[in-house]
């Protein structure tokens, strides 16, 4: 098992590669979160990944690699108040990417939704122990979430394929907001199914950038969607 000092060096190197400049206290909080995830995972089976090194790459750095894009979209000037700066993490599970985003970006407000109560209990515990006033958890299906303000960004990492993601959560997106789905290989088949379902009449694909996860030899893409101008009318 890699020691804590080595893991910290790996995380700091990964943050530099991603382009995230975090204070030492924020890095401490990221590690405190990983410690909580390992502790709770032994009892509640929050994730199949259990080795600390893999948790660092497959969970933490995988989520942090998406933070620049998520934060930029959340802070976008064209998203009006009160949705500006608000992010919804759908199917957050053990808190990815919601908690790393909240730790890295204190000005961004993150609501994490999951249908599994033990997972939202863990997220609520993390909020309390890590002192994250900009993070909250909600237990229940996203399609039943009642939120009048809307969100500048709605994201998911391992929730569902694109058609379901759009159908279940799209109504919560604020005008000019972005749906940002975290995917592995380029999801052409999912995009084709979106078109076949008729969703492209209301939604457009703004970009599908490939992102690099430090220490992980696997493809990662973000699918960035927004409502077509005609859908706002």
Swiss-Prot record:
Its main location: cytoplasm. It is found in: Cytoplasm. It is an enzyme of class 2 (transferase). This is Ribosomal RNA small subunit methyltransferase G. HAMAP family: 16SrRNA_methyltr_G. InterPro entries: rRNA_ssu_MeTfrase_G, SAM-dependent_MTases_sf. It comes from Cupriavidus necator (strain ATCC 17699 / DSM 428 / KCTC 22496 / NCIMB 10442 / H16 / Stanier 337) (Ralstonia eutropha). GO terms for molecular function: rRNA (guanine-N7-)-methyltransferase activity. Belongs to the methyltransferase superfamily. RNA methyltransferase RsmG family. One of its GO terms (cellular component) is cytosol. It holds the Pfam family GidB. It catalyses: guanosine(527) in 16S rRNA + S-adenosyl-L-methionine = N(7)-methylguanosine(527) in 16S rRNA + S-adenosyl-L-homocysteine. SUPFAM superfamilies: S-adenosyl-L-methionine-dependent methyltransferases (SSF53335).
């Amino acid at each position: 098992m890699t020691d804590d000092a080595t893991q910290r060096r790996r995380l700091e190197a990964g943050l530099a590669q991603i382009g995230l400049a975090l204070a030492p206290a924020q890095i401490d909080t990221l590690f405190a979160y990983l410690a909580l995830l390992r502790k709770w995972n032994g009892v509640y089976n929050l994730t199949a990944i259990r080795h600390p090194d893999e948790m660092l790459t497959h969970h933490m750095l995988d989520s942090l690699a998406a933070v620049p894009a998520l934060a930029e979209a959340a802070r976008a000037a064209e998203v009006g108040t009160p949705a500006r700066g608000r992010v919804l993490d759908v199917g957050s599970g053990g808190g990815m990417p919601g908690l790393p985003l909240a730790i890295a970006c204190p000005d961004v407000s993150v609501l994490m939704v999951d249908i599994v109560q033990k997972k939202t209990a863990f997220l609520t515990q993390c909020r309390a122990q890590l002192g994250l006033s900009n993070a909250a958890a909600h237990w229940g299906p996203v399609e039943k979430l009642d939120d009048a303000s809307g969100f500048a960004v709605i994201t998911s990492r391992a929730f569902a394929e694109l058609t379901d993601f759009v159908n279940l959560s799209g109504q919560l997106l604020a005008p000019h907001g972005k749906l940002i789905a975290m995917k592995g290989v380029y999801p052409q088949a999912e995009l084709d199914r979106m078109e076949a379902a008729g969703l492209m009449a209301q939604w457009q694909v703004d970009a599908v950038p490939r992102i690099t996860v430090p220490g992980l030899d696997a493809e990662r893409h973000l699918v960035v969607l927004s409502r077509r101008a005609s859908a706002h009318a």
